[in-house]
Amino acid sequence: MALKEYKPTSPARRHMTVADFAEITKAKPEKRLTKPVRKSGGRNAHGKVTTRHIGGGHKRRYRLIDWRRDKDGVPAKVAAIEYDPNRTARIALLHYLDGEKRYILAPVGVAVGDTLLSGADVDIRPGNALPVRTIPLGTVIHNVETAPGSGAKMIRTAGSFGQLMAKEGGYAQIRLPSGEVRKVLQDCKATIGQLGNVESSSVRVGKAGKSRWLGIRPTVRGLAMNPVDHPHGGGEGKSGQGNPHPVSPWGQKTKGLKTRNNRRTDKFIVTRRRPGVRNTQR
């Protein structure tokens, strides 16, 4: 993937970059492998806004991705590399030898015509899915399960990858893109390689209208609001927030407050991610 720039015919065009989509080989998805997406506008079943800054955007169909890779031993040929509007990574259409078709996330190095496999005794090559116990230490992986058979839950963003660090006592230690080292059972499956569309994080939107195409509405600062709308609002001119600690519109402390409260899975974290480091591998 490469980024495409435009002539500076406007301030938006000057700063905008887009993916060149050179790797895409098929324009329309397999209809049987899609389903409709109903937009929520950030509202729940009662019509109340539960997630702000969501609404509008281009109409989409959801692509059904094979997260489990459970067709062990059945060869699959890569028929196409497609765009998926619901995620940053590209997706690959697989045609299995028994006639079934499935989508997977497309890793770097997988091209149309390649044959992919899943199972315990398959080759270590990009796109193949194996139990972690059969993967050599130091191998770059993605699409990692957190429980055997649950389907991939970790390392699914474009350009991301993890690394198998150690195996001990039925568990494997995997370094995640955030720098965190986490334990998973060795029977969990993972896919070999780094996910494609590597430069996705470097794309510059360029203009507000493009965010609206993506279904992202404006984010208004609390400081710019009236006191009735936000604790930071009001005052004459550009006055401060008036609070000893930044708060949300509902008065809860924000910015720097710890949000993780899942002690049940703390035992699986070997090394915490480093604060302020989003991805240490790029």
Swiss-Prot record:
Pfam families: Ribosomal_L2 (PF00181), Ribosomal_L2_C (PF03947)
Record carries keyword Nucleus: no
One cellular component (GO) term of this entry: large ribosomal subunit
Keywords: Ribonucleoprotein, Ribosomal protein, RNA-binding, rRNA-binding
Residues spanning the membrane: none
Gene Ontology MF term list: rRNA binding; structural constituent of ribosome; transferase activity
A GO biological process held by the record: cytoplasmic translation
Residues covered by region (Disordered): 31-54, 223-282
InterPro entries assigned to the protein according to its UniProt record, in alphabetical order: NA-bd_OB-fold, Rib_uL2_dom2, Ribosomal_uL2, Ribosomal_uL2_bac/org-type, Ribosomal_uL2_C, Ribosomal_uL2_dom3, Ribosomal_uL2_RNA-bd_dom, Translation_prot_SH3-like_sf
Recorded family membership: Belongs to the universal ribosomal protein uL2 family.
Entry function: One of the primary rRNA binding proteins. Required for association of the 30S and 50S subunits to form the 70S ribosome, for tRNA binding and peptide bond formation. It has been suggested to have peptidyltransferase activity; this is somewhat controversial. Makes several contacts with the 16S rRNA in the 70S ribosome.
Protein name listed in UniProt: Large ribosomal subunit protein uL2
